[in-house]
C-alpha cells in the first residue's frame, strides 16, 4: 500500500555502507523523537550509531540535512491508487493518510514541519525538497478524474489534497488520546470525502451514463 519516500540529497563522500547509513538514520530518529530539534546533536547521533562524527559529515553537510533524511526515509508515501473513479480513489487516499498521520512516522513528520518554522537551517533544507508526496499522488487522481469527465478541469489538484489531508491531520491531532480508539474513523472519512466531492462538483460515472442526464 505504501512505499518509501525519496530521501533528500546527500553530499558525495566515501562509498556508502548501507548498514552504517541505516544505523545512523535510526539513531537520528531516536534522538529527535526523544529530544526534539533543540536537543538533536550530531555528537549524540554518532554515539548511538557507534560511528565517528566525521563519518556523518562525510555523508550529510549538517545536522538539518541528516534529520530531514532520517525522517523522510522512514515515512511511507501515499499513492499508487487507481480504483476507477475519484470517489473510490479519494476514500482510499483518506484511509492511507489517516493511517500515516496516526503512525510514529507521521507524528515525526508533523513535528519536523513545525520545527522548521522556528529554525532557519532546518527551513532551508526542507525548502529545497520537492512537493510533498501526497500532493503529487493526489494530482494524479484528480487528472484522471478530469479526463473521465468527473470534475471540471479548473479544479486545482493541490486544493483537493489539502482539503482531505489537512482535515484529517487536524482531526487526528485535535482528538484527545483517550477518545482516539473510540472515534468513528470510517464515518468521519466518509463524511469528509463526500463533503469535498460535493464542493468540487463531482459527477459520478454512473450518473453521467444515466439516460436521464440527456434530457
Residue locations for each model-derived region?
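Short, structured helix-loop boundary elements
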Residues: 21, 42, 64, 83, ...
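Hydrophobic/aromatic-rich alpha-helical bundle segments in the mid-to-C-terminal region
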Residues: 124, 132, 146-195, 200-215
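Amphipathic alpha-helical segments used for helix-helix packing
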Residues: 65, 70-71, 101-128
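Short, basic, alpha-helical segments at the C-terminal edge of helix-turn-helix-like DNA-binding modules
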Residues: 71-77
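Hydrophobic/aromatic residues within well-ordered alpha-helical segments
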Residues: 63, 70, 97, 101-105, ...
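Hydrophobic alpha-helical connector segments
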Residues: 78-110, 160-161
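Short hydrophobic/aromatic patch on the recognition helix
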Residues: 50-60
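Basic, helix-initiating cap at the start of DNA-binding domains
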Residues: 1-48, 65, 77
